[in-house]
Amino acid sequence: MTDQHPTPTPADVWMLVRHRPAVLRRSTQELATALAAAHGSRFALWHTDELLIGIRDGRLTLHTLGGTPLEPPRVVCVRQVAGPMDNDREITLLRHLDRMGATLVNSLDAQLKARNKIWQLQELALAGLPVPDTLSYATAPLEGVVRSPDLTTPCVVKSVNGAKGAQVFLAPGPQLLHDVAGSLARETPFLFQQHIAHSHGRTLRVIVVDGAPVGAVMHTSRHTALAANIANGGTATACTGRHPEAEDLAVRAARALGLHIAGVDLLFTSPDTYTVCEVNAVPGWRPDMTQVTPAITACLTGHLARAAADPQRTH
């Protein structure tokens, strides 16, 4: 693999994206273009597989694969999807950048809370926000979990760190759970969540930046499917400002997790009441949600100004 940055110049703002050959999402490309326009040569985009981290002579170090030493940026815009992050890989890289003095947006603590759906629900519930009743486990055998008297059906079954609607299905009754328990992947736990029938096949996604709702979209599934994700063939309709109570709830959910940038998925418990389904620390957005990219660009510029003014942030 060749070094994609043979003579990198010091950059104040980085965008960190997943390893190659993964294709960048359209929204990530849009944001990268905006950041390049705002910061010029002081902006750089790095893939996680382009960087080497280390310790030399008692100091933390950062290099390209080609051996070129790098100064840490002041601000890192994290666009690596939180769910699939590996604790010993991407998270270790983020921690290294944080310990070298870079400001991560979102912060490492917020990324960790967002990457696990149970961690999210713990924080949201403790903040007094509405969430569906949920059951999960640590090391209990899955065959025993699905026979627990505390597990009620119908329920939605999800991997605790799934993304884009993957590994999500509706279990209408206990027999299906008993039948599939032996064939479900065991790498990560599952959660079993109350099925919100009023919202079946519908999810309201609100993008929150720096404590303000900057875009909202209604996702609707195909036919009678449960998951409304675009990745699963769902449709999307912009609805910014049409559900103010939902947007307020999304702001509170992002705040509870410490997220400056968030995509909050809400379910309808009635035509005008909502519960928090889950929160995404690296949200995507549609081209017609034109306020999102300028809001994130301004958010990162604000973090850059604060980092530059902080004498304790040294490089």
Predicted regions mapped to residue ranges:
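Extreme N-terminal starter segment of soluble prokaryotic enzymes
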Residues: 8-14
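Protein kinase-like catalytic core scaffold
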Residues: 155, 214-215, 262, 275-278
